[in-house]
Amino acid sequence: MMPGLKLYGALILCVLVLPFSRPSSQVLDCREVRSSFQFLYPGMKWTPETPVSGSDLQVCQPKGLTCCSRKMEERYLLIAKQNMESSLQATSAQLKGLIIQNAALFQEAFDMVLRLGRNSTLMVLREEFPGLGAGASGAVTQLFLDMSLYILGSDANVNDMVSTFFSRLFPLTYRRLLGNGAVAGISEECLRGAWKGSSAYGSFPKMMMTRLSRSLLATRVFLQALNLGIEVVNTTQHLRAGRDCGRSLLKLWYCPHCQSLLEARPCRPLCVSTMGACLGGTTEVQPHWRAYVDELGSLAAAMKGEQDIEAVVLRLHVIIRQALKQAVASKSKVSAQVSGMCVHAPPRVSRAVPVSAEHTSASTVNHNRPPMNFDPDETLFGRRREFISGLRGFSQFYSGLGEALCSKEPTSLNSSLCWNGQEMTDKFPGPGLKRVHPHGSESKQKTPEPVISQIIDKLKHINQLLRMVTLPEKRWRARQGGGGARRNPSGPGQTDEDEEGLESGDCDDEDECTGVSGLGPPPRRKRLRIFADLADNLAIDDLTLHELLLTPRLATDAHGGSSIPGAAHVPTAAFIFTITIIIFITLGLQ
C-alpha cells in the first residue's frame, strides 16, 4: 500500500511542478509563428512547418532549432527598419508641429502688422497731407513692400529703404506741401537728395532707420531661426536605418519570433543602446539644440520696444507725420537751403503756390482721429512668450530621444522577463546575478553621421546670430541708464502729444516687460485675429495613426492570443500531459 501511495505522490508532484518548469530546450511549435508572419506578409509561405536548424540565418542564429527561414529573416529586417523610421517620425511629430504651426502664424501675423502699418500711414497722408497726392502713396507702398521682403531674407538694407522713401517723398513735400511749386532750375534728381543737406525732416529719418533696423532685424532672425528649427527636426525625423542598425533592430524585435517567443519584449538597456546607435550620433546635437532654445527665448524676450515690429510699425505713421510737420515748420529755412543747393541759374523770384486750407489744417486733423493700435492684450509678445514656453518643454529632446523611442515599446505580460538579444532573461537580476550588458556593434560609440554634422553646424551659426541680435539691445538699454528723458527731436514746438509712440523701450503692460524664463505657464490672453483663423487651418492632427506604426505590437496581439514570454507553447504540452496523468491516477485508484 505504501509503495503505491509513494508512486501516486510522485505523480502528483510531477503534475504540480511540470507546468511551471522552464526547460532550457523547449519544444518549438511553428504554427503561431507562421500565423504571425502571414499577418505581416499575407500569402507568403516561407515559415517552415516544423523547426529547422537555421544554418542559413545571418542574424537570428539559434542555439538549437528555429522557426525562421532566410527569407523570413530578410523580411523581418525590412519591417524592423520601417518600424524604427515610423517610430522616429511619430516621436518628433509634436515638436515639428509646434514649430511649423507657430512659424506660419508668426509669418502671417508679421505680414498683417505690415499691412496695418501701411494702411495707417496712407490714412495719415490722405487725411492730414492730401496735397501730396498719389506719389506719396506710392512711396509708402514701396517702403512697406521692401520691409516685407527684408524679413523674408532679401539682401536689402533698412537704412537704404528709409533713405529711398524720404528721397521720393521730398520733391512732393517741397513743391506741394511747402508751396514752392515748379521752381525753375531745380531738377528732380537734386530734390531727391536735398532733404539730407537741408535737414528738412529733422532727426526723424534717423530715428526711423534706428527703429526699423532693430525691429526688422529681430523679426527676420526670429523667422530664420524658426525655419532652421523645422529643418533640424525634419532632418532628424527622416533619418534612415542603415545596414548595421537594421541588423541590430532585427535582433532586438524579431529574433525572438524565431524562437516562438511572439510576445517577448526587449530589455531596456539593449533597446536604449540599439536606438542610440541607430540615431547616428543625434545625442551630439543636444548641447547645440539646448542653446538654440535658450537663445531663441532670449531674443523673443528682447523683442519689445524698439525691437518689436508691432510696436514700431504700427506707430510708424507718427514718425512720418512728425517729419512732415517738421518740414512745414521750417519751410523758409528749407526752401532757402534747397535753392542754394539745387538752383544753378541766377535765382529768380517765383510766385509760390499758396498753401491750401487742406494743408494748413494738417496739424489739427490728427488729434480728432482715434488712435489705430491693437488691444494691449492682443500682442505678438504674448504669443511669442506662449510659443517659447511650449518649446522649452523640448529643450532636452535630443538627449532623451533614444529613451523616448524605447518608451513606446508595449509592456510585456510577464514583467520579470525580457529579451537580451539572445535569450529570455530576468529583467531585474538579483544582487548575486551578473547583469547582461548590451554587446556588439550597437554599443560602440560612432562619430555623427554627415547629415547630423551639418545640422550641428547650422545650429552653431544661428545661435551665434541670435546672440548678436539680442546682445546689442541689452547694451543699448544699459547705456540708456534706465530710460531717462529724451531731448525733443523736433524742437520746442513739439508737444508731448505729438511724440506719442516715439519713446523707445516703452511697455504698455508691465507684465509684458518681464523675461520668459521662470514665468511658468503663460497667461491666457486674447489672440490676434489671424492667430484665431490660422489655428483652425493649421491644427496638427492627433498622433493616433502614428502610434499604430510604432515598434511592433507583435502579430499575435491581433489574433487575441496572449502568453508568457519565454514559455509560449510549453503550458499547452504540460496541460495535455497533466490531463493524461490525472486519468491514469483515476484508473489506478479504481
Curated annotation (Swiss-Prot):
Major site of localization recorded for this protein: membrane
Signal sequence segment: 1-25
Disruption phenotype: Morpholino knockdown results in severe defects during epiboly with most embryos arrested at 60-80% epiboly.
Lineage start: Eukaryota, Metazoa, Chordata, Craniata, Vertebrata
Protein name (database record): Glypican-3
Disulfide bonds: C30-C67, C60-C255, C68-C258, C190-C342, C245-C278, C267-C418, C271-C406
Biased composition (Acidic residues): 495-513
Post-translational modification: O-glycosylated; contains heparan sulfate and/or chondroitin sulfate. Cleaved intracellularly by a furin-like convertase to generate 2 subunits, alpha and beta, which remain associated through disulfide bonds and are associated with the cell surface via the GPI-anchor. This processing is essential for its role in inhibition of hedgehog signaling. A second proteolytic event may result in cleavage of the protein on the cell surface, separating it from the GPI-anchor and leading to its shedding from the cell surface.
Gene Ontology terms describing biological process: cell migration; cell migration involved in gastrulation; coronary vasculature development; negative regulation of canonical Wnt signaling pathway; negative regulation of smoothened signaling pathway; positive regulation of canonical Wnt signaling pathway; positive regulation of endocytosis; positive regulation of protein catabolic process
Assembly behavior: Heterodimer; disulfide-linked. Cleavage by a furin-like convertase results in production of alpha and beta chains which form a disulfide-linked heterodimer.
InterPro entries: Glypican
Source organism of the structure: Danio rerio (Zebrafish)
Membrane topology: Lipid-anchor; GPI-anchor
Glycosylation (residues): N119, N234, N414, S504, S517
UniProtKB keywords: Cell membrane, Disulfide bond, Glycoprotein, GPI-anchor, Heparan sulfate, Lipoprotein, Membrane, Proteoglycan, Signal
